[in-house]
Amino acid sequence: MGMTSDSIADLLTRIRNALMAEHLYVDVEHSKMREAIVKILKHKGFVAHYLVKEENRKRAMRVFLQYSDDRKPVIHQLKRVSKPSRRVYVSAAKIPYVFGNMGISVLSTSQGVMEGSLARSKNIGGELLCLVW
């Protein structure tokens, strides 16, 4: 698995494709940033769980996907906002409310990667990585 120039977009695409194919899990290359994003998705119930595994001195992450009782993905959309070619930064006041608060935004802040509502409550902005609903 080669790292693309945008590993976050790659992570979101892999999750999106795995959900469309109704897979139970998806394997992705591990990075601290990717794990931080997946950890938030797990905390908010968008993924079931994940584990980090070591293979041939390379770290991989297995993300177990979450489906509703009628086997529909609980994630409707994963949208990359900030991109390497066009970074998007927001102040705390400009952190979006996603899909009538059913969704989340994920930010990279001076205090680490966190969910938008947490950044808003701490009154800190940052790079708007992605939206999930």
Curated annotation (Swiss-Prot):
GO terms for biological process: translation. It comes from Chlamydia pneumoniae (Chlamydophila pneumoniae). One of the primary rRNA binding proteins, it binds directly to 16S rRNA central domain where it helps coordinate assembly of the platform of the 30S subunit. It comes from the Bacteria. One of its GO terms (cellular component) is ribonucleoprotein complex. PANTHER family: 40S RIBOSOMAL PROTEIN S15A. Part of the 30S ribosomal subunit. Contacts proteins S5 and S12. Belongs to the universal ribosomal protein uS8 family. NCBIfam families: PRK00136.1. Disulfide bonds: none annotated. Gene3D superfamilies: 3.30.1370.30, 3.30.1490.10. Keywords: Ribonucleoprotein, Ribosomal protein, RNA-binding, rRNA-binding. GO terms for molecular function: rRNA binding; structural constituent of ribosome. This is Small ribosomal subunit protein uS8.
